[in-house]
């Protein structure tokens, strides 16, 4: 038996390394997101919604920073949710829900949250649905609460330079894959599919996403800020940037 079968923390570690191939400064991004929470809670224990939370990456870091936080993690992927559940145990409420429909909110254990965080996830949603989701998220935040979305968000004021940065990052990533020093996205999922415990859940995932996720859609920061403003948030802006990735925040 490999350690990945018995130990959810080994899966967490492998997921982190796989994701860092795409975003080497990923931890700095999480720090900026948690700093944003800290700015709105006035020292209180925060109630935080980890949206499209996957393996629980954000929840784990939130609890490390705010040990008394009330965490809710929402996702649809059964394999990633299994890793999250095993890692978080009773420190978070795990919710299975589809963000592609407005009904996802009915599964939440709380009516309002201090913060909603999401990272590298919402680019799977089409433009019209993402705009609707932004409006729904405003309604699950308390007045003064904050939403932070970190994702691939090119800087539309530097289109050519951004393209070159992305091309160079892809070349470096592919070189690491070729050298065997990092797992690619597909390699990680192949490993999960071969695991006796996770394999059946990966198979179930394929029934949920029979052709994989929908095509990725990565609009610039300006699109997100306009959509968040249209959703009714009182303040919107960028709280972090690293190359072609950024984190935008919106205050109810």
Model feature map: region roles:
Residues 49, 56-104:
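Class I SAM-dependent methyltransferase SAM/SAH-binding core
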Residues 120-124:
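Short catalytic micro-motifs in class I SAM-dependent methyltransferases
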Residues 117:
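A conserved beta-strand element that flanks and buttresses the S-adenosyl-L-methionine
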Residues 231-252:
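Core SAM-dependent methyltransferase catalytic element
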Residues 215-231:
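Short alpha-helix
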Residues 1-43, 57-61, 148-184:
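Conserved class I S-adenosyl-L-methionine
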Residues 131-143:
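A short glycine-rich, Lys/Arg-flanked "PGG" loop and its adjoining helix->strand segment in the class I
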């Amino acid at each position: 038996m490999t350690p990945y079968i018995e130990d959810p923390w080994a899966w967490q570690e492998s997921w982190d390394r796989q994701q860092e191939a795409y975003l080497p400064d990923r931890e700095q991004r999480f720090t900026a997101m948690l700093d944003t929470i800290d700015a709105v809670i006035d020292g209180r224990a925060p109630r935080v919604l980890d949206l499209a939370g996957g393996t629980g990456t954000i929840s784990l870091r939130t609890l490390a920073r705010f040990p008394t936080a009330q965490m809710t993690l929402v996702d649809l992927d059964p394999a990633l949710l299994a890793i999250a559940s095993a890692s978080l145990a009773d420190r978070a409420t795990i919710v299975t829900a589809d963000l592609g429909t407005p009904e996802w909110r009915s599964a939440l254990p709380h009516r309002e949250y201090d913060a909603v965080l999401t990272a590298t996830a919402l680019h799977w949603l089409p433009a019209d649905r993402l705009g609707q989701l932004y409006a729904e998220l405003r309604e699950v935040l308390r007045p003064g609460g904050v939403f932070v979305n970190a994702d691939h968000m090119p800087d539309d004021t530097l289109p050519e330079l951004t393209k070159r940065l992305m091309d160079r990052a892809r070349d470096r990533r592919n070189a690491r894959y070729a050298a065997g020093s990092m797992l690619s996205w597909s390699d990680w999922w192949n490993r999960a599919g071969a695991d006796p415990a996770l394999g059946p859940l990966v198979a179930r995932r394929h029934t949920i996403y029979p052709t994989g996720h929908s095509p990725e859609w990565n609009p610039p920061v300006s699109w997100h800020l306009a959509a968040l403003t249209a959703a009714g948030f009182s303040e919107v802006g960028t709280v972090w940037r690293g190359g072609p990735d950024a984190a935008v925040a919106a205050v109810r």
